Amino acid sequence: MTITLGQSTKNDKDLFDTMDDWLRRDRFLFVGWSGLLLFPCAYFALGGWFTGTTFVTSWYTHGLASSYLEGCNFLTAAVSTPANSLAHSLLLLWGPEAQGDFTRWCKLGGLWTFVALHGAFGLIGFMLRQFELARSVQLRPYNAIAFSAPIAVFVSVFFIYPLGQSGWFFAPSFGVAAIFRFILFFQGFHNWTLNPFHMMGVSGVLGAALLCAIHGATVENTLFEDGDGANTFRAFNPTQSEETYSMVTANRFWSQIFGVAFSNKRWLHFFMLFVPVTGLWMSALGVVGLALNLRAYDFVSQEIRASEDPEFETFYTKNILLNEGIRAWMAAQDQPHENLIFPEEVLPRGNAL
């Protein structure tokens, strides 16, 4: 009986192993399995947006000009939402609405659903890319977790909110001025600025900006001197073994300024991660609430007193009047199919207007 020891010369790699080797190969631009989702979706989302803002009108959906071809500029061009009558249709090119006609598909607002869906999956692909790379180089996945916050905001605003309303029509169009108009709509119809979830979101974003400014300035203030390193490209050497700045000095400085300071870098940087991510998550949760038409804070006692006493007015009651004005003007403009007509006598009046 003979036993042969050794490796088989037969190549046992299957198709999956071959693809895995190619996708995760060390190259200038990492592809990875996540790239199969990220790159095509990002390409189609950006391509659809550039196509729409360059050529496609919103006349048939909003009664507006929205492309460079019609005279818009970068701030006023947009890929606008489908008409309200199309409700929540996916508006597939081969669907019953467009029936394979590309021109009709563009007129109906098909580019919006195209850009929104590919954009959402592109963002998810980018988050998965961070997970994949972190796993490959044995890092923890906090970058991907942090990026989940803007994804949550995007999905809640562009998908969850219009799904709770009557159609995609009530989502934001993809354009600068269009987003501004959507913000005004949110304020007028939902009193968004007085929503506690919006307040948490603003606190998170502005708090994160403050933390970044303080952290960057503190690091610059407490850099260790390293000879000529600050004046040469040695200052950018990514493999230095020593610390870049003095945490002890920074701690003493802020202890004297505020009376309290971060005692270690782990807690400091976790806090810088926690503040903006939690703020954005809370904003996304608030938008989900708006999809269900949940109300913001209402100070009804002030409204009742203001209606009875012409000399009593607060910033809150002034804002309520402004919201009523926004609703009165926007409803008639945004929903012409409803034939909404507001006589002069029912339009809001007050010091705010």
From Swiss-Prot:
Descriptive protein name: Photosystem II D2 protein
SUPFAM superfamilies named among the record's database cross-references: Bacterial photosystem II reaction centre, L and M subunits
Positions annotated to bind chlorophyll a PD2: 198
EC number annotated for this UniProt entry: 1.10.3.9
Recorded name of the encoding gene: psbD
Keyword set includes Iron: yes
InterPro entries the record matches: D1/D2, Photo_II_D1/D2_sf, Photo_RC_L/M, Photo_RC_L/M_CS, PSII_PsbD/D2
Reactions this protein catalyses: 2 a plastoquinone + 4 hnu + 2 H2O = 2 a plastoquinol + O2
GO molecular function: chlorophyll binding; electron transporter, transferring electrons within the cyclic electron transport pathway of photosynthesis activity; iron ion binding; oxygen evolving activity
Further comment: 2 of the reaction center chlorophylls (ChlD1 and ChlD2) are entirely coordinated by water.
The entry's keywords: Acetylation, Chlorophyll, Chromophore, Electron transport, Iron, Magnesium, Membrane, Metal-binding, Oxidoreductase, Phosphoprotein, Photosynthesis, Photosystem II, Plastid, Transmembrane, Transmembrane helix, Transport
